[in-house]
């Protein structure tokens, strides 16, 4: 079974013996630097200096759909969460962290904002690091007026991102007033507190949020600029009379 993105066709596959809904496509080995590299490589449509170089997975000397392979896994190696509680005199603090390690994300937004081909729309400043003869170590293929080499029309490993993250899911800090102060407002006890959710996310993923919701029963980790989890802060007071 294969699941599809909206522009690049099939991006995931489910089969016996493999992770559920793993990412499937062409494996990018790098960028062709010169004509000699093109000539030495397997036959590949659109091959030229500045274009992606794909892996000849089956070794038949021709790059085509038969060379699609596993390029990522949206399933994490492990999930974790832990609570921490502290108190000192009248102060108390509790927090909950959770995270995901080892999962990949297919960044579908890159198909639009990072494409080396311009179609009368805005692009990310990241494409300024596009390949030129004087910039051979570029991250992106050479800029072009057309999409070449199936670079941004077929699923490939260029769009796979590390989706690992650690998130401060909740934090509460409280201060219990001394009884002498609480009694002045006619209370037996009073506690002021701050409560926050989704305050901090530690991740290498550059999108809005690495915690990507499932896009289908067999399409996980497909990032299309979904709105991130919101951060919420509140103040409160608990009073007992």
How would you name each of these model-derived features?
Residues 18-22, 35, 46-47, 100-191, ...:
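Extracytoplasmic gating/loop element in the C-terminal half of outer-membrane beta-barrel translocons
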Residues 78, 89-91, 164, 186-190, ...:
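Outer-envelope beta-barrel architecture signal
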Residues 81-83, 170-174, 234-236:
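Membrane-embedded beta-strand positions in outer-membrane beta-barrel channels/transporters
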Residues 87, 98-100, 195-199, 240:
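Outer-membrane beta-barrel pore domains and translocons
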Residues 90-95, 180-181:
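Repeated loop/turn-to-beta-strand initiation elements of outer-membrane beta-barrel proteins
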Residues 95, 192-194, 237:
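Membrane-embedded beta-strand positions of outer-membrane beta-barrel proteins
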């Amino acid at each position: 079974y294969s699941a599809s993105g909206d522009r690049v066709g099939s991006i995931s596959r489910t089969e016996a013996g493999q992770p559920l809904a793993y990412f499937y496509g062409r494996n990018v080995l790098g960028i062709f630097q010169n004509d000699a590299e093109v000539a030495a490589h397997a036959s590949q449509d659109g091959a030229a200096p500045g274009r992606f170089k794909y892996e000849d997975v089956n070794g038949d000397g021709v790059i085509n759909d038969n060379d699609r392979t596993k390029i990522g896994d949206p399933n994490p190696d492990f999930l974790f969460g832990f609570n921490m509680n502290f108190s000192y005199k009248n102060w108390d603090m509790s927090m909950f962290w959770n995270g995901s390690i080892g999962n990949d994300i297919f960044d579908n937004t890159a198909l639009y904002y990072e494409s080396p081909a311009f179609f009368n729309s805005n692009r990310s400043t990241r494409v300024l690091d596009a390949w030129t003869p004087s910039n051979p170590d570029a991250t992106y293929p050479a800029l072009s007026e057309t999409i070449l080499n199936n670079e941004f029309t077929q699923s490939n490993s260029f769009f796979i991102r590390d989706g690992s993250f650690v998130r401060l899911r909740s934090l509460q800090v409280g201060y219990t007033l001394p009884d002498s102060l609480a009694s002045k407002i006619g209370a037996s006890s009073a506690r002021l507190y701050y409560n926050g959710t989704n305050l901090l996310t530690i991740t290498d993923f550059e999108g809005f949020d690495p915690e990507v919701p499932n896009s289908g029963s067999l399409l996980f980790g497909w990032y299309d600029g979904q709105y991130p989890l919101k951060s919420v802060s509140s103040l409160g007071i608990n009073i007992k009379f």
